[in-house]
Regions:
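Short amphipathic alpha-helical/adjacent loop interface patches that line ligand
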Residues: 1, 25, 67, 83
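DNA-recognition element of transcription regulators
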Residues: 2-3, 38-48, 60, 73-92, ...
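G2-box/ATP-lid motif of Bergerat-fold
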Residues: 95
Length: 111
């Protein structure tokens, strides 16, 4: 519910730029050199959440809950698969901005 309310409060065409990637928060889309990257809803939600909190490390459970809106203890392993897919889809934009923090989770690299 909270995630839905945050989406509703966004202004149209709110944008976020991280490196060479542009996030259209209203359309829930990621662009690289004006080319849309095809992310699933879950991939986009995880990617956006990390990008909005650069440098902050999140556990798989935290990312699952942020992306899907409920406790993800049983399904947190799905985050690993989503991260793998996100990295593959962001590969044309260069080195992955998502860093694995071993034993903890993932974070969006600063810079």
């Amino acid at each position: 519910v909270a995630a839905h309310l945050r989406r509703e409060q966004r202004t149209p065409h709110a944008r976020l730029r991280r490196g060479t990637l542009d996030f259209d928060l209203a359309e829930r889309a990621v662009y690289w050199q004006d080319t849309p990257l095809k992310l699933t809803k879950g991939e986009y939600a995880i990617c956006e959440y990390l990008a909005m909190h650069p440098g902050q490390t999140f556990s798989k459970e935290q990312l699952y809950e942020a992306a899907f809106g409920y406790d993800g203890e049983a399904d947190a392993s799905a985050v690993t698969e989503h991260i793998k897919n996100i990295r593959a889809k962001l590969r044309p934009a260069g080195e992955s901005p998502i860093e694995t923090v071993w034993g903890v989770g993932y974070k969006w690299k600063n810079g």
